């Protein structure tokens, strides 16, 4: 195969290191890095890279919250501090330019609530840009599901999973393989019906016919 084909295959999965991470251990970060073909450190994420002994392929940001040391052997991309997009979105834009298909964002939950809510918005904005996109840390994982189905494989780190509608109402919701199963159900945005579910089987099947669901997996702590 050609060099360009190899590069495309190589950059299939992207790991984005964010500055704020909850309960992320070096082992967890290194395991995710091993499955990634391209690693982006978003601004303060370069400090996490140093902390975990990871080598990013690119460091991107406005460097308002961290100094630009340029001590990694990689590409550095600087944005003006008064830019219209966050460092997280700048990293996602770069992942798109690199033709990455799967994106794991390490961190970005907890901490400042406005940032967490903004990151849920990014899951929505970039939903069709990538084959898969998910925020992960030591406490939670979050991803979106729109008008389609998904299989969740049991992950021992996260005992619970919950569904939250991002529409006024999501309908045609099926859940199989879980402690609490649903068939053709509707979920309103204000409803707590979808929270605190658990795996019964090794795989849970979730389907929504009409609407957007935020899928959150949470650790038991």
What are these regions (language model features)?
Residues 114-124:
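Short Gly/Thr/Asp-enriched flexible loops that form oxyanion-binding sites at enzyme active sites
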Residues 127-141:
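Short, acidic/small-residue loops that bind anionic groups at enzyme active sites
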């Amino acid at each position: 195969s050609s060099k360009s084909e190899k590069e495309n295959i190589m950059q299939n999965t992207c790991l984005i290191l964010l500055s704020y991470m909850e309960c992320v251990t070096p082992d967890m970060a290194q395991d995710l890095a091993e499955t990634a073909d391209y690693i982006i450190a978003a601004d303060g994420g370069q400090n996490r890279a140093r902390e975990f002994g990871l080598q990013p392929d690119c460091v991107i940001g406005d460097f308002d919250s961290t100094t630009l040391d340029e001590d990694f052997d990689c590409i550095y991309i600087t944005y003006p501090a008064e830019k219209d997009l966050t460092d997280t979105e700048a990293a996602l834009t770069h992942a798109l330019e690199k033709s990455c298909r799967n994106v794991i964002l390490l961190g970005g939950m907890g901490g400042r609530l406005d940032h967490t809510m903004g990151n849920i918005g990014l899951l929505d904005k970039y939903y069709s840009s990538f084959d898969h996109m998910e925020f992960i840390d030591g406490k939670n994982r979050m991803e979106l599901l729109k008008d389609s189905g998904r299989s969740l494989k049991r992950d021992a780190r996260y005992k619970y999973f919950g569904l939250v509608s991002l529409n006024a109402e999501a309908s045609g919701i099926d859940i199989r393989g879980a402690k609490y199963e649903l068939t053709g159900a509707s979920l309103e945005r204000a409803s707590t019906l979808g929270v605190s579910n658990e795996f019964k089987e090794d795989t849970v099947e979730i389907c929504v016919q009409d609407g957007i669901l935020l899928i959150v997996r949470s650790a038991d702590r």
